Amino acid sequence: YVHTNEEARDYKVLRCKTNQIDKLEVFIPAKKETVIGGFEFLDDYILRSEKSDAIPKLFVRNIKTNKEEEIKISDEPIGVPGVSLMQRDTNTTMIRVGWESMATPGQVYEYDIVSKQKKLVKQTEVPSGHDSANYVVERIKAKSHDGQMIPISLVRLKTAKQDGKSKILLYAYGAYKHSISPSFSASRFCLIDRGITFAIAHVRGGGDLGDRHHEKGKKKFKKNTFLDYIACAKHLIEQRYTYKGGICFYGGSAGGLTGGAVANMAPDLFFGMLLLVPFVDTMTTMLNEKLPLTPGEWEMWGNPIKSKEYFEYILSYAPYNNPVSYTHLTLPTIAEV
């Protein structure tokens, strides 16, 4: 079995008989906006992962019948599954599957592939106490400026009303093909328990929907990242999860660049910006080739030293070069020295 991205930007799986590498055939084909992940083997089954529509999934395939099914551990719409083959014996139908979501801390189940029976064997404890049943996890989509649908993952109190009166902490990153998993973080719940919704905008530039999702959010397409985020913010307002001026941006480093850019482009949507070591002086950094990290960063942002086009493009969005009035915004930042 061969896991490859040759002529398949988001990978595919090929197979051949032993010593017949020249006779490879497609086993798992490439799929649009789906990242085909790795796989594990039992004697009679193949376990594999993929991320489709920014949602991680696990599948099991019977080698003899070639029938494949998704392993569903939870009724929650989105989460982060994982498989671990703890035992040396591969002649088994019993595996261990991990699960967590934005509402549920990490769990480990024993799962029987044939019977589909599961048994909880480990539950991550939250010292302050936590009941996942008190919360709801949702997945919605916003239409960006060019028609691209951008996923939004969110978690909130089950008792929270969708009446356009709640505040939202809306996270984004959008760079380096880095995917943001809809995973659990106990620290968020001090806000969620106060009625604030936590959401993730899976904007372009990251890798949530595969390589094309990344490519359309870098270099000359970088503004797609910011426009995607603004589209997500407006959609949350339209769907009455929040209201205009009820959103706080949250992000760091390259995500801080996203925050700085959207603060300049649509300041009226936000009441605050939580920026962690934000990359807001983009132009000055990209012009200084003596900085050790700058040459490697040109692959993400473009080289403004050699290209007038990139110089003008970066200058048009770099937060430090495009300030507006922030009198109504709270702008805490955290910087490393």
Where are these regions (language model features)?
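Active-site-proximal cap/loop segments of hydrolase catalytic domains
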Residues: I200-L329
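Cap/lid segment of the alpha/beta-hydrolase catalytic domain
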Residues: T124-Q239, Y243-G245, G252
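Structural motif
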Residues: A8-L14, A54-F59, T104-Y109
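Beta-strand C-termini and the immediately following turn/loop, strongest in propeller blades
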Residues: Y1-E7, Y45-A54, R96-M102
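Structured, non-catalytic alpha/beta "coupling" segments that mediate domain-domain communication
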Residues: D10, M94-Q117
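Single conserved hydrophobic/aromatic residue that forms the stacking wall/gate
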Residues: H328-V337
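Multi-bladed beta-propeller domains
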Residues: K17-E40, K64-L85, V114-N134
